[in-house]
Amino acid sequence: MKFFAVLALCIVGAIAHPLTSDEAALVKSSWAQVKHNEVDILYTVFKAYPDIQARFPQFAGKDLDTIKTSGQFATHATRIVSFLSELIALSGSESNLSAIYGLISKMGTDHKNRGITQTQFNKFRTALVSYISSNVAWGDNVAAAWTHALDNVYTAVFQIVTA
């Protein structure tokens, strides 16, 4: 039990540097421009990193261009984007830290149980940022805001995945 209490404190500490209101606004406004492109976002991740696609039993070994148009692919893409949308909606307010922690903790635990590695998480991050930066106005300020946001999330997730 002590272990989980310490882990919770570490995770809260990792996200204890919430985005400023300006950073949150930049992340939210850029995300609003792409969040309805769920299928394209997941397609970009799988296209860049086929090993990530292979981690999904329902998509492993299948032609990406064929599955891209399936309902199963759209459903999973929507789950991923909805999770990100929820985190982003909560960002920028310290009063939401416990809610953010809860979401990150569940996602981290679920992915740890599936054997997802830090490397795979980082590949997802790279593909996600590549997609966003290619589809919105992307300046140094937007890049810095996304880096801060994703650093917070990934620090917390990695504490769970490596625990």
Swiss-Prot record:
One of its GO terms (cellular component) is extracellular region. SUPFAM superfamilies: Globin-like. Keywords: Heme, Iron, Metal-binding, Oxygen transport, Signal, Transport. It comes from the Eukaryota. InterPro entries: Erythrocruorin, Globin, Globin-like_sf, Globin/Proto, Mb-like_M. One of its GO terms (molecular function) is oxygen binding. It holds the Pfam family Globin. The keyword Metal-binding applies. Residues 1-16 form the signal peptide. Residues 18-162 form the Globin domain. The keyword Heme applies. Heme b binds at H76, H111. PANTHER family: GLOBIN-LIKE PROTEIN. There are at least 12 different components in Midge globin. Belongs to the globin family. This is Globin CTT-Z.
